Amino acid sequence: MLALLYIPAALAEITGCFSFWAWIRLHKSPLWLLPGIASLLLFAWLLTFSPAENAGKAYAVYGGIYIIMSLLWSWKVEATPPDHWDLIGAAFCLVGAAIILWMPRSL
């Protein structure tokens, strides 16, 4: 299912953005930016395969998936597990993304 491409797209974007975070906030080498930029390019390319009917809706749906993946990143990479409010908020976002992507457009 093409909708699953949002997951690797989110992982690529988060990885790319984290490389900048690591460089600036964690004082890592600027060499961290090289794989980060490659990840951001991969993210942009993957998002073009979205099943959404236009770019704006693709980005809106992606936003819901991005939130889930960001919380997973925080938990697994940065050792900060989500609390119950994070999970409730993420569930709302996921429902919203599903509505935007899959609900019929005609009445």
Swiss-Prot record:
Membrane topology: Multi-pass membrane protein
Keywords for this protein: Cell inner membrane, Cell membrane, Membrane, Transmembrane, Transmembrane helix
Locations listed in the record: Cell inner membrane
UniProt keyword annotation of Cell inner membrane present: yes
Bilayer-spanning residue ranges: 4-24, 29-49, 55-75, 84-104
Main location: membrane
GO cellular component assignments: plasma membrane
Pfam family, one: UPF0060
Database matches in PANTHER family: UPF0060 MEMBRANE PROTEIN YNFA (PTHR36116:SF1)
Family: Belongs to the UPF0060 family.
Protein name: UPF0060 membrane protein ZMO1566
Species this chain originates from: Zymomonas mobilis subsp. mobilis (strain ATCC 31821 / ZM4 / CP4)
